[in-house]
Design a protein with these regions (language model features):
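Active-site-adjacent betaalpha module
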Residues: 1-18, 72-197
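Short beta-strand segments at enzyme active-site cores
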Residues: 21-22, 59-66, 147
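Long hydrophobic alpha-helices with heptad-repeat/coiled-coil character
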Residues: 31-32, 41, 50, 54, ...
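A short alpha/beta connector and helix-capping loop motif
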Residues: 15, 33-61
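Active-site loop signature of alpha/beta-hydrolase-fold enzymes
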Residues: 27, 69, 153
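Glycine-rich, proline-tolerant flexible connector loops at the mouths of alpha/beta enzymes
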Residues: 35, 68-70
Length: 197
């Protein structure tokens, strides 16, 4: 009789990331609304790749969304709903917040701390939610990996959205790792094959 040993039970928990998808809400794709990101298609495609990969290999997934009692991100309006194709599964975490950082939700902060403090961040908007979350993760001693091509930023006054987003990625480099979706997937796939997944 052969003994089967689950190598995952011996894995360093801090090396297993949670995929955090931030604000994949209709507000960001509902043109001509104020928070609509015109060139969100590539970011959404890469978010979809990351989500499919995380689900396929069994990584934890967390969805966060902005909720506010205002004309934007109002739960009474359909714009606060998930973008079709990005609805959380019942086995996935869902958190709501009213401030830019994901850590504005205490349950998120607790889940990340208790889950090893390593997460992969993608979604909207880079210049607010993603940047604020990366900075706060650094201050809490958590490890964040930002999928820059699975995120998008809004323009700021006369600064083009693409310039803002490039700057956000450079700033997040100060607080964590910045990579592409395909590079992250390749790295995760290699890690899983080493563990025997």
């Amino acid at each position: 009789m052969k003994n089967v040993v689950n190598l995952r039970s011996y894995a360093n928990v801090s090396l297993i990331p949670t995929l955090v998808l931030l604000d994949l809400q209709q507000e960001y794709v509902a043109s001509p609304r104020l928070f609509s990101i015109p060139d969100a298609d590539e970011a959404l495609q890469n978010c979809r790749l990351a989500l499919t990969h995380a689900r396929r290999i069994g990584l934890p997934v967390a969805f966060l969304r902005m909720i506010d009692r205002a004309p934007y991100f109002n739960p009474a309006l359909s714009y606060s709903n998930w973008i079709p194709g990005f609805e959380p599964m019942t086995s996935e975490m869902v958190f709501e917040r009213s401030k830019p950082s994901c850590y504005a939700n205490r349950e998120f902060a607790y889940a990340m701390s208790e889950g090893g403090g390593h997460f992969v961040l993608a979604g909207f908007s880079g210049e607010a939610g993603c940047l604020a979350t990366a900075v706060e993760a650094f201050h809490r001693g958590h490890q964040v990996t930002y999928l820059a091509d699975a995120s998008a930023s809004l323009r700021l006054n006369q600064i083009a959205a693409s310039t803002v987003h490039q700057t956000v990625a450079e700033l997040i480099c100060l607080y964590g790792e910045v990579t592409t979706t395909r590079s992250w997937i390749a790295e995760q796939s290699a890690s899983v094959s080493c563990v025997g997944g």
